[in-house]
């Protein structure tokens, strides 16, 4: 919480310096890396190590959902498939492309819209 008085009297300052916050502030002013930087970096490192376990657990769960197929299961899947010949597929797809019964129709423009003809 912000204090109302910006400046403290000597008596107030001495009382504040005796508190834990006052002693920590004075130590931080003298050695900022030791009392601010080092705890900050330690917290960041500890959090990364702590959250790495959660990430590993998440990937373990995902791996459990995706299971490897055994040879028997793979053979069961192959039973129902039809055999594919490249030439037959090529000619089949060519026949699908021969649809010349369509007609290009221009979409009417809205009133006031330009034709974009150069």
Curated annotation (Swiss-Prot):
Transmembrane feature ranges: 32-52
> Which GO cellular component does the record give, naming just one?
mitochondrial inner membrane
Q: Where is the signal peptide?
A: none
**Which InterPro entries does the UniProt record give?**
Cyt_c_Oxase_assmbl_COX16
> Chief location of this protein?
mitochondrion
Give the location in the cell: Mitochondrion inner membrane
> Which Pfam family is an annotated match for this chain, by its short name?
COX16
Task: Report the membrane topology from the UniProt record.
Answer: Single-pass membrane protein
- UniProt keyword annotations, A-Z: Membrane, Mitochondrion, Mitochondrion inner membrane, Transit peptide, Transmembrane, Transmembrane helix
Q: What does this protein do?
A: Required for the assembly of the mitochondrial respiratory chain complex IV (CIV), also known as cytochrome c oxidase. May participate in merging the COX1 and COX2 assembly lines.
Q: What's the family?
A: Belongs to the COX16 family.
**Name of the protein in question:** Cytochrome c oxidase assembly protein COX16, mitochondrial
């Amino acid at each position: 919480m912000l204090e109302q008085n910006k400046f403290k009297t000597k008596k107030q300052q001495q009382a504040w310096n005796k508190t834990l916050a006052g002693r920590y502030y004075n130590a931080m002013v003298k050695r900022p890396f030791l009392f601010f930087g080092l705890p900050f970096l330690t917290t960041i490192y500890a959090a990364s190590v702590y959250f790495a376990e959660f990430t590993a657990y998440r990937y373990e769960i995902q791996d459990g959902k995706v299971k490897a197929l055994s040879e028997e299961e793979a053979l069961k899947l192959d039973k129902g498939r039809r055999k594919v010949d490249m030439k037959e597929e090529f000619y089949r797809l060519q026949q699908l492309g021969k649809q010349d019964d369509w007609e290009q129709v221009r979409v009417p423009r809205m009133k006031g819209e330009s034709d974009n003809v150069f």
